[in-house]
Amino acid sequence: LVEILVAVMVFSIISTISAGVFVSELRNQRKSLASQELFDQTSYLMEYMSRAIRMAKKDDLEGINCLSGDKVNYEIIAGQGIKFRNYKDECQRFYLENFQLKEEKGGGVSDLTSVPLRVLNFNTNLIGETQTDNLQPRVTFFLEIESKEATKIKIQTTISQRNPDIER
């Protein structure tokens, strides 16, 4: 009787430890997958936005007034977005709304981030956005994004406009 009791107790301890390790590994796997999703989506987002901003044109066409100034390259909107004329001569805007990064282009609005991700911060900084400053336009943008597993990433990049900023 004592031997059976000891055997059951040892089996219970080993089973409990094994189950704990298994649950811990599942939790780590879920966190790892959430981090990978966060990195993948953030990488895509940075590449997409960088390309669009790099290919922007000066707002100097008759009849197309995307920006409030004359011959301006970019414009910061309400501290949480950037607006410009893209290479297809459409007004394009990236902005933060309800923890989601959105894009407005050609009259339509689309989400750039998926629902499980929350954009906590989106800041932009402009250098050389006007024609008269003799600087090639540069945009720095900063993103802080959090996944549903509470993994956060902070990332910043600076892009210069592809087209030379010369007077015409």
Regions found by a protein language model. Give the residues of each.
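Aliphatic-rich helix starts adjacent to a transmembrane/signal segment
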Residues: L1-R54
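Type IV pilin-like appendage domain
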Residues: E62-Q131
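Short linear sequence signals and composition-biased patches located at protein termini or domain-edge surfaces
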Residues: V109-R168
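Short, hydrophobic secondary-structure boundary micro-motifs
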Residues: I14, L61-E62
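Short, cationic motifs built from Arg/Lys/His that form the positively charged side of catalytic pockets
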Residues: S43, R54, Q100-E103, R162
